[in-house]
């Protein structure tokens, strides 16, 4: 009888532990099997938490999540982002990002000038989420993403009062 009780206790303990670390269900990007995404994924071991939110398991290749409930989702393997005049392009920690804030308080940040692209979906709600600056300012996360070589970078946009510089004439 003690063996049966011990086995039941082990099963119960395993169930409790499994309940504490639920897997985040995500879909892999089309290019998730790119070897550069594997390089990023391996280096995400150096990012155990972001803004106080612990990393969680995901069920899709080249993805990651932080927080319970998840406040940061990462997907590697998207097509390289094209230049745009509608999205803000920012640089932080050596990585350029296109920022889509059309679904506030959620932000979608996609690397610019890297192939394949990495995308972050961030709950930026001050009450329940995490600061986007804490996410993209995380040095270990930036170092992981920077393993994908940059081919383009953000350029400064002229302000509304900028005067165009005339091109030289011959």
Feature locations, PLM:
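N-terminal secretory signal peptides
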Residues: 25-77
